[in-house]
């Protein structure tokens, strides 16, 4: 099989915990591009937070952002696909989190809207050295009810994130998608949003068959994408659930797993 499209998760797959990219991964992505493979990013990050990594990797393709809620071209920023959250249920979810004293961020037009400044904001922004515009709101539920959000993200201790997501799933799971993107982060998006759905949309737009698509990830929010791709790969550091549904588990991020996969599974296959 000649693979034509490679979709890469960022954090834990391409980007290390210190927000660096292994030179071996950078070189392998360049080699894939030189071989004619379209390489893109599929991330929970907003477009503004994904673009610096796309630039560093010389990726000038549509990027899948916000867990698949948005497909936006790099570097122009042109939006090719977008799904926003219904106001009433988004306000309900925000209110639930605030009542439980959990820090929540609403993403509206690439601006982070918050109800109060707390240490969790600094923790979250530490993953975004490029910076982000933050807006303090007196009534965050009212703001999201009136202005459609692309995503909600909450920050909590690892032992709190799981139960909180379960509670949100019971309350709003028939109207919003809940997912875990990090041990400290839970996220909500519009019903139907997933990296897998966005990747299918992008492949269709590009005229690439499902069988020619490769996806690599490590977390819960990569499940649909890895399951949908013609070749779905789980990082060695991936959660067990992802390894269970992937076609293959590759080396961990510490061992430049993406570089290994490109060399042994994509370029060798393309050369055949």
Residue ranges and their predicted role:
Residues 47-50, 90, 149, 161, ...:
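A general structural signal for well-ordered alpha-helical segments in protein cores
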Residues 57-59, 66-67, 75, 171-174, ...:
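Short, structured coil segments at secondary-structure junctions
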Residues 1-5, 22, 34, 187-272:
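Mg2+-dependent phosphoryl-transfer enzymes with acidic/Ser/Thr/Gly-rich catalytic loops
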Residues 96, 100-216, 220, 225, ...:
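Conserved acidic, metal-coordinating active-site core of Asp-based
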Residues 2-17:
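Asp-based phosphoryl-transfer active-site loop
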Residues 20-125:
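Active-site phosphate-binding/coordination module
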Residues 25, 50-54, 164, 168, ...:
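Hydrophobic packing residues within well-ordered alpha-helices of enzyme cores
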């Amino acid at each position: 099989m000649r693979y034509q499209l490679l979709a890469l998760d960022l954090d834990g797959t391409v980007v290390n915990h210190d927000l660096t990219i292994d030179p071996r991964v950078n070189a392998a992505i360049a080699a894939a591009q030189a071989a004619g493979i379209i390489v893109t990013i599929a991330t929970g990050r907003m477009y503004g937070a994904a673009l610096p990594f796309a630039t560093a990797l010389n990726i000038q393709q549509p990027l899948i952002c916000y867990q698949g809620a948005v497909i936006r071209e790099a570097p122009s920023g042109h939006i090719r696909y977008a799904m926003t959250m219904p106001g009433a249920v988004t306000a309900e979810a925000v209110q639930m989190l605030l009542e439980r004293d959990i820090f929540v961020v609403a993403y509206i037009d690439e601006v982070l809207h918050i109800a109060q400044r707390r240490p969790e904001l600094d923790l979250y922004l530490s993953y975004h050295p490029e910076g982000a515009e933050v807006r303090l709101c007196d009534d965050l539920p009212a703001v999201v009810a009136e202005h459609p959000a692309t995503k909600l993200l909450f920050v909590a201790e690892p032992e709190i994130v799981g139960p909180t997501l379960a509670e949100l799933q019971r309350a709003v799971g028939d109207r919003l998608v809940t997912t875990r993107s990090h041990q400290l982060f839970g996220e909500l998006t519009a019903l139907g949003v997933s990296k897998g759905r966005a990747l299918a949309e992008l492949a269709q737009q590009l005229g690439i068959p499902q069988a020619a698509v490769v996806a690599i990830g490590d977390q819960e929010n990569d499940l649909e994408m890895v399951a949908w791709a013609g070749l779905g790969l789980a990082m060695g550091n991936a959660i067990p659930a992802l390894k269970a549904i992937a076609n293959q588990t590759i080396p961990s991020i510490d061992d430049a797993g993406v570089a290994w996969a490109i060399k042994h599974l994509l370029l060798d296959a393309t050369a055949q």
